[in-house]
Swiss-Prot record:
Pathway: Secondary metabolite biosynthesis. GO terms for biological process: propionate metabolic process, methylcitrate cycle. GO terms for cellular component: mitochondrion. Its EC number is 4.2.1.-. One of its GO terms (molecular function) is 2 iron, 2 sulfur cluster binding. The gene is oryR. Keywords: Lyase. This is 2-methylcitrate dehydratase-like protein oryR. 2-methylcitrate dehydratase-like protein; part of the gene cluster that mediates the biosynthesis of oryzines, natural products with an unusual maleidride backbone. The two subunits of the fungal fatty acid synthase oryfasA and oryfasB probably form octenoic acid. This fatty acid is most likely activated by the acyl-CoA ligase oryP to give octenyl-CoA before the citrate synthase-like protein oryE catalyzes condensation with oxaloacetate to form tricarboxylic acid. It comes from Aspergillus oryzae (strain ATCC 42149 / RIB 40). The keyword Lyase applies.
Length: 496
């Protein structure tokens, strides 16, 4: 009988990846004007998306607020934007993270992994708000978290998540991309809390050591609303882990690399991480804003469909009668994420179906909106939509995939070819969607989107005040709690 060798129980150093994340979080000085400008846009875009979610989706609105049987107000808690709720740190992180993400209308960053960096704001802003209220309550206004610190944490969370996304395909091993929200938020919440560098390493190590969510809830046949609150779950876990370490819990030094038991061997099929560029502020500088409501890899297909719809209208043609075939060329990611046939069971299913998006736009002749994905939408039951879906084919264009991954290009191209009954073909190719860094109108459109979304719960005067405040030089010195207070509806408004 072979007797197993004794385990080596010498204390290892923290994994290099953990050191890289924490050193960046604590040391890097952001000196990019573009990053600061776009961080402000990302902030108001995410908060607008959060308010849009609770205004539009009864499902989302039902999830937020205190956990039964608590009261709606936790003294010193996080004041949840768009509502009258004041909740504890964990529920606050969950609620805001879920609200930002629920309708798939927040920003996106492409790569070997796909993700949405503004998800991290759920953990960052809720923590900053509570820490600021705590400092003010004990008479230490000099210890509040400033909005510059919030923006710093946001830029760095974007960077940590995005740089991992470039080459590390968690989807290939069946894991969901919110693993990166948990890791990035863990680092930046630790920094906001004032934890020591060693404590921050401990928090990040625990984030990697968690058993991670499966991607199953984003893919057919199980796509459903969990993909909308998964980010909130990751935000909540990041705050929870930081609080555990704050209370004295030690880290797991080789959580990633330990043979047999670590992340690489257990969950990553023995692969190792590849970080192709240093952590700077590049992700914030290049993140894709969603100025229209469509899954990121289908945004350009929607734009192409709009142009073709205009051509059909000019000819007096009806899509359901005069189109015999629709051929869509997309990237590899689009083929994996939004390529669906068969029945669509819920809003989360519809907003991840390129055929549905294209069909609705062709029939409407205008932009698809959040409401068009909901169960209550007439499009969800319109047989004409199913007719167009049934004659739509999808295929990968290798050049689109290549340009998608090229760091000098980063296109998200789609092309549509619509064949009419008389044999005429209408073709449209869109390489860069509205919201892309290469589209000069992007930041203005993001502002207009935020203005519209914030107005769903706040008065026009308050919305104007928020946008003006963010534009002021003194904004960076503003206490996070004062900023959050601007998003609480006036008493005359109904809470979510």
């Amino acid at each position: 009988m072979t007797i197993p060798a004794a385990d080596d129980n010498n204390c290892p150093s923290y994994d290099k990846v953990i050191d890289l994340i924490v050193d960046y979080a604590y040391d890097y000085e952001i000196d990019s004007p573009a990053a600061w400008t776009r961080a402000k846009a990302a902030l108001i875009d995410a908060l607008g998306a959060a308010i849009e979610s609770i205004h539009t989706s009864p499902e989302c609105a039902a999830m937020i607020g205190p956990v039964w049987p608590q009261t709606a107000t936790v003294p010193g808690g996080f004041r949840l934007p768009g509502t009258q709720f004041q909740v504890d740190a964990l529920k606050g992180a969950f609620d805001l993270g879920g609200m930002i993400r629920y309708l798939d209308h927040n920003d996106a960053f492409p790569g070997a992994e796909w993700g949405h960096p503004s998800d991290n704001l759920g953990a960052i802003l809720s923590t900053a708000d509570i820490l600021s209220r705590e400092a003010l309550a004990r008479g230490s206004p000099e210890e509040v978290i400033s909005m510059k610190q919030v923006l710093t944490a946001l830029i760095k969370a974007y960077e940590i998540q995005g740089v991992f996304q470039i080459r590390n395909a968690f989807n290939k091993v069946g894991l969901d991309h919110v693993i990166l929200v948990k890791v990035a938020s863990s680092a930046m919440v630790s920094w906001l809390m004032g934890l020591s560098r060693d404590q921050a390493r401990a928090v990040v190590s625990h984030a990697w050591a968690d058993g991670h969510p499966l991607r199953v809830y984003r893919q057919a046949p199980n796509a459903g609303p969990r993909k909308g609150w998964a980010a909130g779950d990751a935000c909540m876990r990041a705050v929870h882990l930081a609080n555990l370490v704050r209370c004295g819990q030690p880290g797991i030094r080789s959580a990633i690399t330990t043979p047999r038991w670590g992340f690489y061997d257990v969950l990553y099929r023995g692969q190792t991480f590849e970080l192709p560029r240093p952590f700077t502020s590049w992700v914030m500088e290049t993140v894709l804003f969603k100025v229209s409501t469509a899954e990121g890899h289908g945004l350009t297909a929607v734009e192409a469909a709009l142009t073709i719809a205009e051509k059909l209208a000019q000819r007096g043609l009806r899509p359901e009668e005069d189109i015999v075939n629709i051929r869509a060329r997309t990237q590899e990611a689009g083929m994996i994420i939004i390529n669906k046939k068969g029945p669509l069971h819920n809003a989360a299913d519809r907003d991840h179906c390129l055929r549905y998006m294209v069909a609705v736009v062709l029939l409407k002749g205008s932009q698809i909106t959040t409401a068009d994905y909901q169960d209550s939408s007439p499009w969800a039951r319109d047989p004409r939509v199913e007719t167009l879906r049934s004659i739509t084919t999808m295929e990968e264009d290798p050049s689109f995939t290549r340009d998608y991954h090229d760091p000098q290009c980063r296109s998200v191209a789609n092309a549509l070819e619509v064949t009419l009954r008389d044999g005429t073909k209408l073709e449209e190719l869109v390489p860069f969607p509205l919201g892309h860094v290469r589209r000069p109108e992007t930041l203005q459109l993001v502002r207009e989107k935020a203005q519209q979304n914030l107005g769903l719960k706040l008065s026009s005067e308050r919305v104007g005040q928020i946008l003006d405040t963010v534009d002021q030089p003194k904004f960076e010195k503003m206490a996070a709690s004062d900023f959050v207070d601007l998003f609480i509806p006036q008493p005359a408004s109904s809470a979510a």
